[in-house]
Amino acid sequence: MAQVKRIRRNVSGIILLDKPLGFTSNAALQKVRWLLNAEKAGHTGSLDPLATGVLPLCFGEATKFSQYLLDSDKGYETVMQMGQTTSTADAEGEVLQTREVTVGRADIEAVIPRFRGDILQVPPMYSALKRDGQPLYKLARAGEVVEREARSVTIGRLELLECEGTRARLSVGCSKGTYIRTLVEDIGEALGCGAYVAELRRTQAGPFALAQTVTLEELEQAHAEGGNEALDRFLMPSDSGLQDWPLVLLSEHSAFYWLHGQAVRAPDAPQFGMVRVQDHNGRFIGIGEVSEDGRIAPRRLIRSE
């Protein structure tokens, strides 16, 4: 008997998931996609299985703008375990070295200012970065270590929240591409005792905060009670991640031409940069870029939601 193909729903929007411990970002995405029965889905940058917290999941038309969330600043709280280093710089790796911990709160407070601002980081071997088409973590699992070029990242916030024994909790605000495992490992070396990430929780992704998230258990409960459609109430608008962008409103006439690929003028447009665009009904219709002549050129358009 032939298997009946599941017809997926054409839904658009963003679900802010509090990613559970032990899930890869893709596993979490596919689970929510199944619950929602969504036709198209994507996430906005990976969180390690060890990590929990804010993971924006994009569906339908919202996937067109996931790159802009990927490029946004992030916030984390992490527990730094001092006295040991591991192969993965987190609790899941093999212990490589154990050292005595003779430092306390005052020592950590004295060290962390040097890691604020623009710093250079060498990406860890256990990362998704690729060398000759191969993810570094696959090379690492095969016992290979390759040279990695240091990359510039920005640490806008680095604060010590608490310190007890050999563990310290840190709050971090950083630019895209920052590896918290590398940051913690580097702080550990600066302290002279080594360190790794024992816990990691993302508290912010762009404009989204932890308080806005929904748990997988809540989504499963809603699905059990009302099916796929019951999850629609958790969907945020497709432009939710762009709320910090300048907003331009187009007249019905201008919106028609803009949606057909033509650059148009708008009285409330800024002098330059990227903008999110709404039509005369206040409906989000895409993003544009203000050109030198003041016209708004369409960059990504959205179908009617």
From Swiss-Prot:
<dbReference type="Pfam" id="PF16198">
    <property type="entry name" value="TruB_C_2"/>
</dbReference>
<dbReference type="GO" id="GO:0160148">
    <property type="term" value="F:tRNA pseudouridine(55) synthase activity"/>
</dbReference>
<dbReference type="InterPro" id="IPR014780">
    <property type="entry name" value="tRNA_psdUridine_synth_TruB"/>
</dbReference>
<dbReference type="InterPro" id="IPR015240">
    <property type="entry name" value="tRNA_sdUridine_synth_fam1_C"/>
</dbReference>
<comment type="function">
    <text>Responsible for synthesis of pseudouridine from uracil-55 in the psi GC loop of transfer RNAs.</text>
</comment>
<dbReference type="InterPro" id="IPR015947">
    <property type="entry name" value="PUA-like_sf"/>
</dbReference>
<comment type="similarity">
    <text>Belongs to the pseudouridine synthase TruB family. Type 1 subfamily.</text>
</comment>
<keyword id="KW-0413">Isomerase</keyword>
<dbReference type="Pfam" id="PF01509">
    <property type="entry name" value="TruB_N"/>
</dbReference>
<dbReference type="InterPro" id="IPR036974">
    <property type="entry name" value="PUA_sf"/>
</dbReference>
<dbReference type="InterPro" id="IPR032819">
    <property type="entry name" value="TruB_C"/>
</dbReference>
<keyword id="KW-0819">tRNA processing</keyword>
<dbReference type="Pfam" id="PF09157">
    <property type="entry name" value="TruB-C_2"/>
</dbReference>
<feature type="active site" description="Nucleophile">
    <location>
        <position position="48"/>
    </location>
</feature>
<dbReference type="GO" id="GO:0003723">
    <property type="term" value="F:RNA binding"/>
</dbReference>
<protein>
    <recommendedName>
        <fullName>tRNA pseudouridine synthase B</fullName>
        <ecNumber>5.4.99.25</ecNumber>
    </recommendedName>
</protein>
<dbReference type="InterPro" id="IPR002501">
    <property type="entry name" value="PsdUridine_synth_N"/>
</dbReference>
<dbReference type="GO" id="GO:0031119">
    <property type="term" value="P:tRNA pseudouridine synthesis"/>
</dbReference>
<dbReference type="InterPro" id="IPR020103">
    <property type="entry name" value="PsdUridine_synth_cat_dom_sf"/>
</dbReference>
<dbReference type="GO" id="GO:1990481">
    <property type="term" value="P:mRNA pseudouridine synthesis"/>
</dbReference>
